[in-house]
Amino acid sequence: MKVRASVKKICRNCKIVRRNGSVRVICVEPRHKQRQG
């Protein structure tokens, strides 16, 4: 899980999701997981 100021889609499988106030990227590739912080 990377914590970044700006989250971006890395590949075409990445999806940007808002979960209880935080913006996250979920993907089939575990290294692409990100969270805005």
UniProtKB/Swiss-Prot annotation:
Q: Output the GO biological process annotations, alphabetical, semicolon-separated.
A: translation
Quote the protein name from its UniProt record.
Answer: Large ribosomal subunit protein bL36
What's a single GO CC term here? cytoplasm
Q: Which gene encodes it?
A: rpmJ
For this UniProt record, the keywords arranged alphabetically read as follows: Ribonucleoprotein, Ribosomal protein
| Pfam families named among the record's database cross-references | Ribosomal_L36
List the HAMAP family: Ribosomal_bL36
Instruction: Tell me which domain of life the UniProt entry assigns to the organism this sequence originates from.
Output: Bacteria
A GO term for molecular function: structural constituent of ribosome
Family the entry assigns:
Belongs to the bacterial ribosomal protein bL36 family.
Source organism of this protein record: Marinomonas sp. (strain MWYL1)
